[in-house]
Curated annotation (Swiss-Prot):
Its main location: cytoplasm. Belongs to the GrpE family. This is Protein GrpE. It comes from Herminiimonas arsenicoxydans. Transmembrane segments: none annotated. Keywords: Chaperone, Cytoplasm, Stress response. PROSITE patterns: GRPE (PS01071). GO terms for molecular function: adenyl-nucleotide exchange factor activity; protein homodimerization activity; protein-folding chaperone binding; unfolded protein binding. Homodimer.
Length: 178
């Protein structure tokens, strides 16, 4: 029983200082609450700023995509302007000779070919004997020929690729099976 009395005295002595410290703890809790409320406000402000920044980034990205679509052919158009200039100059010549016309057309064709190359517009020029590739060639007719079946006999019209994407297939005549 002495042990119980001893424990009761210790518990009572512990409670007394605790109640004496209670007024000191309350301001600390109030300070913690105020600090927590301030932190919540700062986090809300930070969240709103991040959200606004994200929305601005998304808007700018969408504007960039819109601009890219709008001006996607600008480089190609810039490359074609000299070709048009050359054709207009050729039409202004009063009495052109056949030789000067041919020379002008050849120069204009070089300009056009350079514009195509600059913009990754490639020609599909199948040669006689090449295997028919349905991804790049369109067989217009099948003719008897002294070569392997399904090989190209002649090219009627060149095809074109834009950056590995088919723009127009080459029109070809193909050898028939024997």
């Amino acid at each position: 029983m002495q042990d119980q009395d001893k424990y009761a005295e210790q518990a009572a002595s512990m409670e007394e200082p605790a109640s004496a410290d209670a007024p000191a703890i309350v301001p600390t809790l109030e300070e913690q609450l105020a600090a927590s409320q301030l932190q919540v406000q700062e986090l809300q402000d930070s969240f709103l700023r991040a959200k606004a920044e994200n929305e601005n980034f998304r808007r700018r990205a969408q504007e960039d995509v819109t601009r890219a679509h709008k001006f996607a052919i600008e480089g190609f158009a810039e490359a074609l302007v000299p070709v048009k200039d050359s054709l207009e100059m050729a039409l202004q010549v009063d009495t052109p000779s056949i030789a000067s016309l041919k020379e002008g057309v050849e120069m204009t064709l070089k300009q056009l070919s350079a514009a195509f190359e600059k913009n990754r517009l490639l020609e599909i020029k199948p040669q006689q004997g090449d295997k028919l590739d349905p991804m790049k060639h369109q067989a217009i007719s099948v003719v008897p020929a002294d070569q392997e079946a399904n090989t190209i006999v002649s090219t009627l019209q060149k095809g074109y690729l834009i950056a590995d994407r088919l723009l127009r297939p080459a029109l070809v005549t193909v050898a028939q099976e024997k």
